[in-house]
């Protein structure tokens, strides 16, 4: 099953107009657009949060690795 063809889309549009009325369609489209916008915003915030957490983990591992290397060098010098 692929995309609906033009006659099928026209039938769907006609049914929507009959169910909701022509005046309600812009309101429905506005609500749908607002929902999509909020979803994209939440996805972006989540991606930024994950990136921040990953950066912190890398910094912690680097710090731990540097500390261990420094400690190992101190024990070999002694």
Swiss-Prot record:
Signal peptide start-end: none
InterPro entries: TatA/B/E, TatA/E
Sorted UniProt keywords: Cell inner membrane, Cell membrane, Membrane, Protein transport, Translocation, Transmembrane, Transmembrane helix, Transport
Transmembrane in keyword set: yes
GO cellular component, one term: TAT protein transport complex
Compositional bias annotation for Basic and acidic residues: 52-62
Region annotation (Disordered) ranges: 46-78
MF-aspect GO terms: protein transmembrane transporter activity
Annotated GO biological process: protein transport by the Tat complex
Biased amino acid composition, Low complexity: 63-78
Subunit relationships: The Tat system comprises two distinct complexes: a TatABC complex, containing multiple copies of TatA, TatB and TatC subunits, and a separate TatA complex, containing only TatA subunits. Substrates initially bind to the TatABC complex, which probably triggers association of the separate TatA complex to form the active translocon.
UniProt name for this protein: Sec-independent protein translocase protein TatA
Gene: tatA
């Amino acid at each position: 099953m692929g995309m609906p063809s033009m006659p099928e889309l026209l039938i769907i549009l006609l049914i929507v107009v009959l169910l909701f009325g022509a005046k309600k369609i812009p309101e429905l489209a506005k609500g749908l657009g607002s929902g999509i916008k909020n979803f994209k915003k939440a996805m972006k915030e989540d991606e930024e949060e994950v990136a921040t957490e990953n950066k912190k983990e890398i910094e912690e591992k680097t710090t731990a690795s540097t500390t261990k290397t420094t400690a190992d060098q101190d024990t070999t010098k002694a």
